[in-house]
Amino acid sequence: MQDFKTHLEPLKEGKNLLGFSGGLDSTCLFFLLVGENIVFDIALVDYNTQKQRLEIIQHAQKLAKTHHKKCYIHHAPKIAHNFEMQARKIRYDFFETLIKEHSYKHLILAHHLNDRLEWFLMQLSKGAGLNTLLSFQAYEKRESYAIVRPLLYTPKDTLKTLAKDLKFFEDDSNSSLKFKRNCFRKNYANSLMQDYSKGIIQSFKFLDQEKERLYPLTIVSQMHGITFFKYSQNALFMVDKILKQKGYVLSFSQKEEIKRSFFSLEIAQKFIIESDKEHVFIALKPPKTLSMPKDFKDRARRLDIPKRLRPVLYAEFLKQPTHDFLTRFKQSLMDL
């Protein structure tokens, strides 16, 4: 469990929130964190799909009270279709609301080595690139917080051994083959983990190290709600990474469209991606279209500010109107 302890370092500073389900993984992580004197609270989503849902909620509340922790419960609306994707969105929206309201610095999740292998195999079968194959990271920076997955190199069998005297609940949906992940688990991942777990751990460590070398640190700046960085051969990787930090995951077809459009398009009617000769920009699309005055348009044009960014900048300009607003933005690009 040395890898586990290494990944706890960030949790020693700031407030922490554990995503808790009452299942094997999050229960083990709960007690491992308690054993390491990590301070945290817990958050649970009730999807109203489990027979034991009320017992799970009561158990979570009792556990939190016993260990002097806050316990947040969210009762999700009924999910009619695409359960896994909708459940994930509900879960992360709930976590991010709590993080914002209570100033949590870290979101702790109980993903383990088996989860990572299942994801890897699923993406491999789709024809994914390195960034998507390795999208599960032990430490993942988001805009206002970081996701920490201390168990990412820990096999599920290790957790089963640790949990032999602990109370936890089995989720019936984990055995349902109508979910693709469960098919990959049953048909491929389980047997690979049973026979080759040590080699799989080492391979993921090598791949993580090589990913860091392939995608070196890129300086990212932000001004007036626009995130930007210098264009390089890793530009698509950076766009994917930044959008993920903002809570949006690009599909393969969207990535292809970004390349075809030379980094100048809208994504999901929500994000603007734009570029000039040297930079790539990412911004939230303004909620409403504003009519820009001619002098603002002219100044933006003379400064070679890309067209898609002008409405974003104008919306920000209205909040803090100064005569050198656009000039300072242009200067920030030159200073990058």
UniProtKB/Swiss-Prot annotation:
Top-level taxon in the UniProt lineage: Bacteria
Key words of the record: ATP-binding, Cytoplasm, Ligase, Nucleotide-binding, tRNA processing
Binding site for ATP: S21, G22, G23, L24, D25, S26
Predominant localisation class: cytoplasm
InterPro entries: Rossmann-like_a/b/a_fold (IPR014729), TilS/TtcA_N (IPR011063), tRNA_Ile_lys_synt (IPR012094), tRNA_Ile_lys_synt_N (IPR012795)
Secreted recorded as keyword: no
Reaction equations catalysed: cytidine(34) in tRNA(Ile2) + L-lysine + ATP = lysidine(34) in tRNA(Ile2) + AMP + diphosphate + H(+)
GO biological process: tRNA modification
Localisation: Cytoplasm
Entry GO CC: cytoplasm
Domain text: The N-terminal region contains the highly conserved SGGXDS motif, predicted to be a P-loop motif involved in ATP binding.
HAMAP family per record: tRNA_Ile_lys_synt
Protein name per Swiss-Prot or TrEMBL: tRNA(Ile)-lysidine synthase
